[in-house]
Regions:
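N-terminal leader/targeting and accessory segments in enzymes
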Residues: 1-106, 110, 396
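Nucleotide phosphate-binding/pyrophosphate-handling subdomain across enzymes
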Residues: 5-15, 25-35, 145, 279-382
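Residues in the short beta-alpha loop(s) of Rossmann-like NAD(P)-binding domains
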Residues: 22, 45, 152, 229-230, ...
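Phosphate-binding loop of NTP-binding sites
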Residues: 31-33, 72-78, 85-228, 232-243, ...
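Short internal beta-strands
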Residues: 38-45, 224-228, 360-361, 380-389
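Beta-strand->loop->alpha-helix junctions that form or flank phosphate-binding loops
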Residues: 40-44, 68-69, 106-109, 241-260, ...
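C-terminal helical cap/extension that packs against the catalytic core
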Residues: 55, 373-431
Length: 463
């Protein structure tokens, strides 16, 4: 009997609540219902607001519902609660339920408990989706059967029973998922740690602690990849219990991957260095993507051949919404970098181009500082188009820089993304590059960065 089979047998008579019916939870609920388990959907939407088709489908399978203002009250009468990453682990009601003896878990936590195969886990403030995808692509190129999930891809728990021990799971994990994790992956990679999501975590200490949970439960055979160029990340080296690997864009490392002075990505261990691929042969632009490749190389080294790594480097075209080329109109190139929800990611995007840009920025206020944007924007941006709740803060940070008076930077304020795109088109000249690089989350205008990116692409394609 597999761990998954035993798990479902043991909870057969339990009452299980699911907070929210997002894509991952919907498949999970269907799985649990198919096992004959009593399920309750908890959602703050009222019955009138709830998706009618989903309601009818789940009701027909025997699912209960707790909807509206007091949707969480029912969890005190349940045995197990699956929270979504969007439901803060230290939420007052969740905390009370936990103290009352209710088991609080998540799709990823339970997947880690039941997964029969090796798990690669990636987290970080920036670069985690691309790095997760690169690891997955490299393993696929080597002929592995790969399952990608977590914060990207699909829910993995619904397919855990189809996995074998020769498969590989590659998961991206956010701080919201990690804060309650009690297991670590076999291979862990932390791309970087910079201020992010402080509107939820409250303090940088809690945010770093959540990220550190990725490696807090390792054993002696675990592998960890850390960023030597990022102070907060390399501080976590003392927590590593297994093999420590590092990467650097700036200098050679003792064990791990680095970029040498000739532009070659290298791997070094036990005094032996192997050159792998030149940075100019990597299809996706930007020095930050070189860092993502170094992270992935260190993570898969020994499992993947150099030939497979080079194949991915030369052919992988990137992930949607990450400096994604949209189109060229009248000699002006348009890029969608909607994923750039933090200043560090925006700076990385600006450094991907060898010219001054027209940048559309602004959005939801995550209570993070924008001062780091001041110098790069004044140096690398010719026109800054601002919208959203953070427009004032970004403009203040940029204009208070000593570089601003001589930069020639023009700042334009707009109210909508439609207006921003039309303004950029009007002000752009042949040879210009326009990027959507928000530096913020999208919650004030869109449900997520993907919706914002898709809207931007639609607007550009309609020009």
């Amino acid at each position: 009997m597999t761990k998954a089979q035993r798990y479902f047998m043991e909870i057969k008579d339990k009452r299980v609540a699911f907070i929210g019916t997002g894509v991952s939870h919907l498949e999970l609920i269907k799985l649990f219902l198919s096992k004959g388990i009593r399920c309750v959907v908890c959602d703050k939407k009222t019955e009138d607001e709830f998706d009618e088709l989903i309601y009818e489908e789940l009701s027909a399978k025997g699912c209960e519902f707790s909807l509206g203002e007091h949707y969480l009250d029912i969890i005190f009468n349940c045995d197990i609660v699956f929270r979504t990453p969007g439901m803060y682990y230290n939420d007052e009601t969740i905390t009370k339920a936990r103290k009352a003896g209710v088991a609080i878990t998540s799709e990823m936590e339970t997947f880690f408990d039941l997964c029969p195969c090796k798990i690669y886990g990636v987290t970080g403030s920036d670069g985690k989706t691309t790095t997760t995808t690169l690891i997955s692509e490299m393993l696929k190129a080597e002929g592995k059967r790969v399952h990608i999930g977590g914060n990207i891809g699909k829910a993995l728990l619904p397919i855990v029973e189809t996995m074998s021990d020769s498969d590989v799971a590659v998961v991206e994990l956010s701080s919201f998922q990690l804060i309650s994790m009690r297991q670590s992956p076999n291979v862990a990679a932390i791309t970087n740690i910079t201020p992010n999501h402080l509107n939820v975590h409250g303090t940088m200490e809690e945010y770093i602690g959540a990220k550190a949970n990725l490696i807090a439960h390792q054993n002696g055979y675990s592998r960890t990849v850390l960023n030597e160029d990022n102070e907060e990340t390399i501080k976590l080296a003392d927590l590593v219990r297994g093999m420590l690997l590092t990467f650097s864009l700036k200098h050679p490392v003792q064990t791990g991957a680095y970029l040498n002075d000739d532009g070659m990505l290298c791997y070094t261990e036990k005094g032996r260095t192997t050159e792998i691929v030149h940075k100019d042969d990597i299809r996706i632009p930007g020095i930050h993507n070189v860092a993502n490749y170094l992270t992935a190389i260190a993570a898969v080294w020994g499992e993947v051949s150099i030939q497979s790594i080079v194949q991915v480097a030369k052919n992988f075209g990137g992930v949607e919404h990450r400096i994604e080329f949209v189109r060229e109109i009248d000699g002006v190139k348009w890029y969608n970098d909607s994923i750039a929800t933090s200043p560090t990611r925006v700076i990385a995007g600006l450094n991907s181009f060898n010219q001054k840009l027209i940048v559309i920025a602004g959005g939801y206020d995550k209570k993070i500082p924008f001062e780091p944007l001041a110098e790069p924007v004044n140096k690398n941006v010719k026109i800054l188009i601002l919208l959203g709740a953070t427009a004032d803060k970004i403009e203040k940070a940029v204009t208070e820089s000593p570089l601003y008076p001589e930069s020639g930077l023009k700042i334009v304020r707009v109210k909508t993304l439609e207006e921003a795109v039309l303004t950029a088109q009007k002000m752009a000249e042949k040879g210009d590059v326009v990027t959507l690089s928000p530096a913020c989350a999208s919650f004030d205008l869109y449900p997520n960065f993907e919706a914002r990116g898709r809207h931007f692409k639609r607007l550009v394609n309609e020009l």
